[in-house]
Design a protein with these regions (language model features):
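Terminal amphipathic alpha-helical/low-complexity segments used for targeting or macromolecular assembly
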Residues: 1-61, 150, 155-166
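Structural signal for interior beta-strand "rungs" in well-ordered beta-sheet cores
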Residues: 58-60, 64-159
């Protein structure tokens, strides 16, 4: 199986039945996600971001990845990521789909539409939706919904114009 296979099997077993929602920090859901991420870290997936087979690893974790996706960031172990065809996710994008706020642990899905581009070091928080043909500038933080064909930037990200695709 190898390290990646063990990480996938472990994460899928640990996170079976996990749903988007708000949970207690340090509670069973939080600890299950934490342990699944430690397994993924130990597998070396983070070091292989950008490798062609990373898309297959993402799919094995339960994420929905379209054809022709250019994935340069580690996928979430939760399996709650959906990326449309021909989209691009640059390096070091936070796709984890969870965050801690005080004593609460928030988990949610992330949706990236077809032909969208996510700039390097961007954070997509749980529940973030990036529409088709949309662009998000590097270093942005997307909290809500980026509509189709829009260009967003900043932290928190705000609309800055129309997306420019070649």
């Amino acid at each position: 199986l190898g390290r990646m296979g063990i990480a996938v099997l472990g994460a899928r077993a640990l996170l079976s039945g996990l749903k988007p929602g708000t949970y207690r920090r340090g509670g069973p859901e939080h600890l299950r996600v934490w342990l699944a991420e430690r397994l993924a870290d130990a597998s070396g997936a983070e070091n292989q971001a950008g490798a062609p087979w990373l898309v297959y690893y993402a799919r094995a974790l339960g994420n929905s990845i379209g054809k022709g996706v250019d994935l340069h960031s580690a996928p979430p172990v939760t399996g709650m990521l959906s990326i449309g065809h021909r989209s691009s996710v640059e390096p070091e994008v936070d796709l984890s789909g969870h965050w801690i706020d005080g004593d609460q642990f928030h988990v949610g899905g992330i949706t990236i539409g077809t032909d969208a581009t996510i700039g390097a070091r961007t954070a997509l928080l749980p529940g973030a939706v990036v529409g088709k043909n949309a662009d998000v500038a590097p270093g942005s933080a997307v909290v809500g919904k980026v509509k189709n064909g829009q260009y967003w930037k900043g932290s928190p990200a705000v609309k800055s114009g129309k997306a420019r695709h070649p």
